[in-house]
Structures are given as structure tokens and as C-alpha cells.
Amino acid sequence: MEHFKNKVLTIAGSDSGAGAGIQADLKTFAALGVYGASVLTAVTAQNSIGVQDVRIMDEDIINSQIDSVLSDIGASAVKTGMLANSNVIKLVSKKIKEHKIQNLIVDPVMVSESGDALLEEEAVMSYVRDLI
């Protein structure tokens, strides 16, 4: 990874169909010659038909993943995707400030391509207050 000039950390959910989420982010980074690291916020069971199940990761493991990557590998930028709820949004905001991240790309994933909700309704304002 040291031969990569740019490193990007994606903080997002996993899409088992690989059409979105961390899987799509990492494929995009690789295609652009950028080293991609990831923090998993949620695991989804989804395919081209829709989302069958969503499990939000515990905040402690999200916190640990962020610290693990940023304290060692580092990141030229952080991209967020599916953050799922207000608590995760607040945690990610806190960690971005704590690690003094200068380049932030916010993709407020709210709904899947098939129309399934991927963000709790009350969390929309958390994006505005805490992350954007």
C-alpha cells in the first residue's frame, strides 16, 4: 500500500450483490489506482430484486475499525455511504474531527436502488447537523 499516493477510506454498508456499498466503492478506487480501505457500518442481504435484510454494526466495532485504519494506514480522503442511523452518523462525525480528516465525501445513502429504506427517517437531520 505504500506505493499508493492516494488512500481513501470508505465508511459504508456492505451490499451482498456488490452493486453498491463498500464493494462498489473499493472496485471504483482500484479502477482509479487509489488504495481503498473500508469500515463496515451495516451488512445487507440484497440483490437486483431488493433488500431482504439489514443488520447495523455495533458502534464499538465501527469506532474500532475507524481508529485501526486511520491510526496506521491513514487516508487522503474519507467517503461515507450507508450510515443507517443518527448514532452512527454522530460517531463518524466525531471520528472525522478527531482524526483531522480534511477531505470528506458524503454520499447520504437513504434508499436502495430498489426503493428500500437504508436510513432511519429521524437520521436525515443528523446528516445536516453533524456531518455536512
What are these language model-derived features?
Residues M1-A77:
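Small-residue (G/A/S/T)-rich helix-start motifs and N-terminal tracts that mark the onset
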Residues T80, N85-I132:
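Conserved beta-alpha-beta core of the PfkB/ribokinase-like small-molecule kinase fold
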